[in-house]
Amino acid sequence: MNPLIFKENRPFDLIAVGRLCVDLNANETQRPMEETRTFTKYVGGSPANIAIGAARLGLQTGFIGKVSDDQMGRFITGYLKDNKINTDQIRIDCTGAVTGLAFTEIKSPEDCSILMYRDNVADLNLDPTEVSEDYIKQSKALLISGTALAKSPSREAVFLALEYARKHDVVVFFDVDYRPYTWQSEAETAVYYNLAAEKSDVIIGTREEFDMMEKLLNYEQSNDQVTAERWFSHYAKIVVIKHGGDGSIAYTRDGQSHRGGIFKTKVLKTFGAGDSYASAFIYGLIQGLEIPQAMRLGGASASIVISKHSCSDAMPTRAEISAFMETAEELV
């Protein structure tokens, strides 16, 4: 069963809001970043990757965000346009803020890390006055991610977008996307993540991310079922808890749970798995698929992306996912 109801006859299937940055992925693998000499540039940021993935799968997608007034900002906007993402609501920063950079290190498939440069970044300067109610009400769904909640005025802009979505029956997806380097403390993070989750229809995160959100609670011991049920007293209809190589579990308000597996692949790097999973999972739900079917799409998409060098460039089409699922071994 798919418990989500999407409004018909809206020009957008999905609008994402939040982080737009640049990934610089190491070309030399099996070595530390200190010894890496060359990198390849890609568009990055969790909501950007998810929007790109959704557009590749055929969804009509838009974006609300802010980019720097320089070559990097123009690179990001141009790439989104090339991928058929509406950029009418991407603002240009006029304060001298820069594009966030993420340098990746690929020592081995099991040992990957990211070095982030997030000081004075343009995406966190998105102002509430730059969030259009008319734009949001034209969409079936809104995607928010946790990084955009890290600082004002982006934080308030996201909460305003949430209010507009709730007002106009736009289904809200919350991808937790916890990045500790943009926050002052775990307590601060937990406060704002919980406030956002309370207004979301679908919450997607890792077990570790949900643990962080529960820091302020007096749980002697938490588990996936307890975590999911907490949100069903608010707006949540689906809570997805990811367990890396052990797959994921989706819980629904009616008490059901669905376990999703993974597809065997040759892993190059681990980052990008969550974004590619979310994009295909959201696509499946918007297309009306049952939750287990949407989870299978998500698992297949994640396996494809972790076998490739990039995140955004590697986001697969529907045909590529179907072909992969026909031949790859599924581990449940």
From Swiss-Prot:
It comes from Bacillus cereus (strain ZK / E33L). It holds the Pfam family PfkB. One of its GO terms (biological process) is inositol catabolic process. Its EC number is 2.7.1.92. PROSITE patterns: PFKB_KINASES_2. The keyword Disulfide bond does not apply. Pathway: Polyol metabolism; myo-inositol degradation into acetyl-CoA; acetyl-CoA from myo-inositol: step 5/7. It catalyses: 5-dehydro-2-deoxy-D-gluconate + ATP = 6-phospho-5-dehydro-2-deoxy-D-gluconate + ADP + H(+). Catalyzes the phosphorylation of 5-dehydro-2-deoxy-D-gluconate (2-deoxy-5-keto-D-gluconate or DKG) to 6-phospho-5-dehydro-2-deoxy-D-gluconate (DKGP). This is 5-dehydro-2-deoxygluconokinase 1. One of its GO terms (molecular function) is 5-dehydro-2-deoxygluconokinase activity.
